[in-house]
Structures are given as C-alpha cells and as structure tokens.
C-alpha cells in the first residue's frame, strides 16, 4: 500500500467511528435500476463524485447540495461521496446532504471496521479488497444495514476474492493503491473475469474524456465512477455521458 494510503488509514483508526445511526432498508435506492434508466435515456451511466480534495478544501453544505443537484440535472445515475476527512476533506454530513438530490448515493471511504458501516445512511458503501478485510462478513453486514456493497478490486487476486463473495457490484479501480498511478488497461484486463460471473461492473478512476468513457463501456463497464473531472465543472457530466 502507498505510504499516503497508510497515513489515511492510521488517521482513520486514531479518529474512531462516528455515532451509529439506523434506517429502514426499504429506503435504499438501487444503482443497477438507475443505471438501466440512464441507458434507456441514451446516456452512459456515470456515478458522479463529490470530491472536495479536487478543490483543495472542504465544502460547505450548500456547495455539496449544489453539486448533487447539478449531477442529477446532467444525468448522473448515482452520486459518490467521499467521507474521509483528513486527506480527502470529506464528511459524513456530505452524504446526508447529497441524498436529498434523490439519486442513489455511494459512501466512499476506507472501511476497516464494521462499526463504520453504521455511521451514516447511504444506498451503497465502498469495500476495498486491498484493505484485507473479511469481505464475506463486510458484504453481509452492509446488506443487513440496508446498503449495497460495492467491492473495489485492482488485481486478479482481489477479483477472485470479490467474486467468491455474495457481492453483486464490483468496482475495478484503474488507480494502483501501491503506486497511485492510473492505467485504463487495468479495467480492460480484469473485466472479462467479472463479466463471466454476471456482476454489475463499475470502472473507477482515469476517465477524463468521452473517448475514455466509451473505451470503458466497450470493455464491459455497466457504470463509470468519475470525480476529479467533474469537480471543476459539473456540466462536464453532460459531455461525458453521451452514448
């Protein structure tokens, strides 16, 4: 793991979990259904990310709400919200605010404790295989709380682990968490294995143009997760998601 990621994990463990909350499972919004609707409307399904680090600062809740509304307006199928505060300058409150836009919301953080799953209501939660957590247990725990797990992988070994669980959504991160380098060929290399298993597949990181977006779709992506490219201007979403 890159030293930057190690530092984030160390800070997260030192910070400890927030107060646990509870919510009815029937309130969960469905990413797969939302992506299917986007396709019917002639759009590439994009999970648009609220990533304060891209602007180098935390965001006021009014700004978070404005991004979420803009993403909904420009056709996002879901919103990803970074909640890690130390490096990515996110917050749990950003999830609550983003959900008011009406789209499925993915909580994106470095989840290493089941207690963290109870911190905020989200529709989906990121589980990173590289953190060496018990994926079976965390997938079951997330579902029990009404959240759909999105299991993130970067290698063949991690893909095998993810496919051995009950996970229905797998994200392939084109960013190497050891070097932080981005390579779209990562998705192209790992996608066939997941396609054979019939899971819903998300391409993460490295999409900066419509050419990149179409390349990931051709390689088998059911949805794309795009962050940095959209923070400078949410209207870019309307250019990236055209089939």
Residue ranges and their predicted role:
Residues 1-59:
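An N-cap/entry alpha-helix motif that binds or orients negatively charged groups
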Residues 45, 56-150, 158, 187-193:
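N-terminal active-site wall of soluble small-molecule enzyme domains
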Residues 11, 51-53, 84, 110, ...:
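Active-site beta-loop-alpha junctions enriched in small/polar residues
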Residues 184, 189-194, 217, 230-243:
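C-terminal helical cap(s) of enzyme catalytic domains, especially alpha/beta-barrels
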Residues 169-206, 210:
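Glycine/small-residue-rich hydrophobic helix-like segments
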Residues 105, 112-123, 154-166, 197-226:
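Catalytic cores of alpha/beta
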Residues 77, 81-83, 123-136, 172-179, ...:
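Glycine-rich phosphate-binding active-site loops on the catalytic face of alpha/beta enzymes
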Residues 8, 48, 71, 120, ...:
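Conserved, mostly hydrophobic/aromatic
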């Amino acid at each position: 793991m890159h030293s930057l990621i190690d530092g984030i994990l160390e800070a997260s463990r030192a910070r400890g979990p927030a107060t646990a909350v509870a919510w009815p499972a029937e309130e969960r919004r469905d990413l797969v259904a939302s992506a299917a609707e986007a396709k019917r409307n002639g759009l590439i399904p994009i999970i648009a990310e609220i990533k304060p680090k891209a602007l180098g600062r935390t965001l006021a809740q009014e700004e978070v709400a404005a991004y979420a509304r803009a993403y909904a307006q420009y056709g996002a199928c879901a919103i990803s919200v970074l909640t890690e505060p130390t490096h990515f300058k996110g917050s749990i409150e950003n999830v609550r605010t983003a959900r008011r836009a009406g789209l499925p919301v993915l909580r994106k953080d470095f989840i290493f404790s089941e207690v963290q799953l109870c911190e905020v209501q989200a529709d989906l939660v990121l589980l990173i295989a590289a953190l060496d957590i018990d994926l079976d247990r965390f997938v079951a725990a997330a579902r029990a709380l009404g959240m759909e797990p999105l299991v993130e992988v970067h290698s063949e070994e991690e893909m095998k682990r993810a496919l051995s669980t009950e996970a229905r959504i797998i994200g392939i991160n084109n960013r190497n968490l050891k070097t932080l380098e981005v390579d779209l060929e990562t998705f192209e290399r790992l996608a066939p294995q997941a396609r054979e298993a019939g899971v819903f597949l998300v391409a993460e990181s490295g999409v900066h143009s419509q050419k990149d977006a179409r390349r990931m779709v051709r390689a088998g992506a059911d949805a794309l997760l795009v962050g940095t490219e959209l923070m400078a201007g949410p209207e870019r979403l309307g250019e990236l998601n055209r089939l």
